[in-house]
Amino acid sequence: MRPRMKYSNSKISPAKCDSTSGRALVPPCKITRSQQKTKDICHVYCMRLRSGLTIRKETCYFGKEPAKRYSLKSGSKHEGRLSTCLPDSRKRSLLGSIQAFAASVDTLSIQGTSLLTESCALSTYNDQSVSFVLENGCYVINVEDCGKNQEKDKVLLRYYESSFPAQSGDGVDGKKLMVNMSPIKDTDIWLNANDKDYSVELQKGDVSPPDQAFFVLHKKSSDFVSFECKNLPGTYIGVKDNQLALVEENDESCNNIMFKLSKM
């Protein structure tokens, strides 16, 4: 008769098994939120128009910096790179923002929003300074010589996309650019083309500039541009007797309608 063998059904915990080899299980080291440093990451997208203007778009988000962690075995510290990638939803949002920015170049003129606003010094072909000066409560237009070391006054220019097709590469997406001009401190006052006496004057507006306050921008050379009246095709802002006036383009008055814009 064979003796009966007894088997134990008791379970040994994994920690006890591992202790037989001189090692104990330790929970993994986790990096707390306080250790996860964040940094501001910005992407800048620039679109350069054929007219030489550059439209700038900046998109920013927060990413995680690499954090220092300690090794369980050696106790030494080393850098581990935390994820700096955006979630898919954030990536889609960022991509959509870029696409909307690119598409906005075609739709801004429909919405009546300026593509770009900047302050520039406006000079004639003969390097005379054009300025809008407030005198006795009214703005006047001055065209005067300026010394070499004298700082030129600036005017405010807003750029728009027009409905006129570009023929000489001075537009964007086949359309010419338009501008209107204002004093720096009074943006509701616009330079207007008066078709009755062929003069140029500053007038206060209500909500949006009228057609006579828009001028189609033509790039004459790398340094000079001209301003054609939107409401009077073939008529430009020009200089007559040291004053701004409306001038029809011809060979004799070509230099009189050329102006230089400089940001200084």
From Swiss-Prot:
Residues 1-67 are annotated as: Homeodomain-like HTH domain. One of its GO terms (cellular component) is cytoplasm. Residues 1-101 form a propeptide. The record marks F101, A102, L108, S109 as: Cleavage. GO terms for molecular function: cytokine activity; interleukin-33 receptor binding. The full-length protein can be released from cells and is able to signal via the IL1RL1/ST2 receptor. However, proteolytic processing by CELA1, CSTG/cathepsin G and ELANE/neutrophil elastase produces C-terminal peptides that are more active than the unprocessed full-length protein. May also be proteolytically processed by calpains. Proteolytic cleavage mediated by apoptotic caspases including CASP3 and CASP7 results in IL33 inactivation. Keywords: Chromosome, Cytokine, Cytoplasm, Cytoplasmic vesicle, Nucleus, Secreted, Transcription. InterPro entries: IL-33, IL33_C. It is found in: Nucleus; Chromosome; Cytoplasm; Cytoplasmic vesicle, Secretory vesicle. The keyword Secreted applies. Residues 66-108 are annotated as: Interaction with RELA. Belongs to the IL-1 family. Highly divergent. This is Interleukin-33. The lineage of its organism: Eukaryota, Metazoa, Chordata, Craniata, Vertebrata.
